[in-house]
Amino acid sequence: MILDAKNLAMPPRLLPVSFTIDAGEIVHFIGPNGSGKSTAISMLSGLFEGQGEITFMGQLLSDYDLPSLARMRCYLSQQDRPAFSVAVYHYLALSLSALNNPRVDHVQHALDEICQALNITDKLNRNIQTLSGGEWQRVRLAAACLQVWPAINPEATLLILDEPAAALDIGQEAAMYKLIRRMAEQGIAVVMANHDLNRTLREADKVLLLNNGSCVVKGSPSDVMTVEQLESTFATQVQRIEHEGRSCLIFND
Ligand SMILES: Nc1ncnc2c1ncn2[C@@H]1O[C@H](COP(=O)(O)OP(=O)(O)OP(=O)(O)O)[C@@H](O)[C@H]1O
């Protein structure tokens, strides 16, 4: 087990919720605006204190120092504009500063793979201030993946992403989910807040549905994302249909 959260809370934003995260597991937090998703996943980063107990790799999260946390997990907050002005490759290099002297050829290989996966290879010499919203988000994602890429960081275990697909078009979103699956296949646990319920239905191993700061239900996507639970939580009409062997949600309002 990577992480064990017991009675995680920050009232009234988040009421006590307990869950575990295993190696290679993809966990989605879903729920309406203001339901506590960002609050919950930000606490897993170890940067925000709240109530309850988080055990991360067998040790209390609060007992880790920041350099150790930077090697073991990465936290990508909700999208913000760049605060400073550097080239993309320079920005990506900042992700490596926490790592223990990774081999240069391994770094180059990781960089090539991540940049190709997120389609930013042609952006490496651009200033981050000049990127579009979706391009900047892909650069932020690339930096996050680089920080916890197993081939250059053997201590990496957890990737925490707050609405990573915000600002991405459907093609770039598909590429992002492919990369997330690739990270999970390498044993990295991925926890994310998400609004695209069809993606959650397809991509998540475990889902926590929040409403008004409380966890309404948690479990597998098919158990959690029933029409009744989604309609009552989101106060909108939902239909779930089967299409080519896959469940698909339709929103009629
Ligand atoms: N820094 C803060 N101080 C006080 N209240 C806050 C703070 N940040 C968020 N909140 C409140 O806590 C509640 C939960 O917010 P949170 O950001 O966790 O929701 P969310 O589910 O991630 O929402 P969204 O889908 O809109 O991103 C909201 O009512 C929000 O207004």
From Swiss-Prot:
GO terms for molecular function: ABC-type vitamin B12 transporter activity; ATP binding; ATP hydrolysis activity. ATP binds at residues 31-38. InterPro entries: AAA+_ATPase (IPR003593), ABC_transporter-like_ATP-bd (IPR003439), ABC_transptr_BtuD (IPR023693), Metal_Ion_Import_ABC (IPR050153), P-loop_NTPase (IPR027417). Its EC number is 7.6.2.8. It catalyses: an R-cob(III)alamin(out) + ATP + H2O = an R-cob(III)alamin(in) + ADP + phosphate + H(+). It is a peripheral membrane protein. SMART domains: AAA. The keyword Transcription does not apply. GO terms for cellular component: plasma membrane. Gene3D superfamilies: P-loop containing nucleotide triphosphate hydrolases (3.40.50.300). Keywords: ATP-binding, Cell inner membrane, Cell membrane, Membrane, Nucleotide-binding, Translocase, Transport. It is found in: Cell inner membrane. Its main location: membrane. Belongs to the ABC transporter superfamily. Vitamin B12 importer (TC 3.A.1.13.1) family. NCBIfam families: PRK03695.1 (NF002981). PANTHER family: METAL TRANSPORT SYSTEM ATP-BINDING PROTEIN TM_0124-RELATED, VITAMIN B12 IMPORT ATP-BINDING PROTEIN BTUD. The complex is composed of two ATP-binding proteins (BtuD), two transmembrane proteins (BtuC) and a solute-binding protein (BtuF). Part of the ABC transporter complex BtuCDF involved in vitamin B12 import. Responsible for energy coupling to the transport system. This is Vitamin B12 import ATP-binding protein BtuD. It comes from Photobacterium profundum (strain SS9). The lineage of its organism: Bacteria, Pseudomonadati, Pseudomonadota, Gammaproteobacteria, Vibrionales. The gene is btuD.
